[in-house]
Amino acid sequence: MPKKIDPLNKKIYGSLTAMLTVSDVKAAAAFYQKAFGFTKRAIMDGPDGKAVHAELTLRGTTLMLGPEIPQMGSRSAKTLGASPASLYLLTEKVDKTVAQAVKLGATAKGPVMDMFWGDRCGTVVDPEGYTWMVATHVAEPTPQEMRKRMKEQMASQGAGQAASAASGS
């Protein structure tokens, strides 16, 4: 009798798995492991010895990596010159994780700061050009507190942007 196959492959994957196109699968996999704590599930090499697929895991989430295939329209954020998507990564120590990512080659896009919805966040762009918002959940504001914090945060950001524009920064 043939083995019954789970069409959703729930033993390995969740409902949604991100797959990033990268310029160098092995280098990207190494960065995500060292910077964000992913674990390597598999890296598959093609006939030429270059990696054609990688699967990394973090707390039950899978991140797949694949190489650019221009003839199929598959290009990395680095090649595009901008991140076509952002990834939101929850970690226990956001400040440490952001600092580690920067040390390994990511670019910080501003300071790590407490956000109105209760997370402390920092944004980095990884060496492949993808934007990662790294966060630690630090508070659970009520909906009323969240609205108040949002207004305050938006007002302070607007004031900061106006000051930057006035100073020519």
Residues covered by each model-derived region:
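Vicinal oxygen chelate
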Residues: 2-19, 29-125, 134-169
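Short acidic-aromatic low-complexity motifs
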Residues: 22-26
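C-terminal catalytic core of tyrosine-transesterase DNA break-rejoin enzymes
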Residues: 128
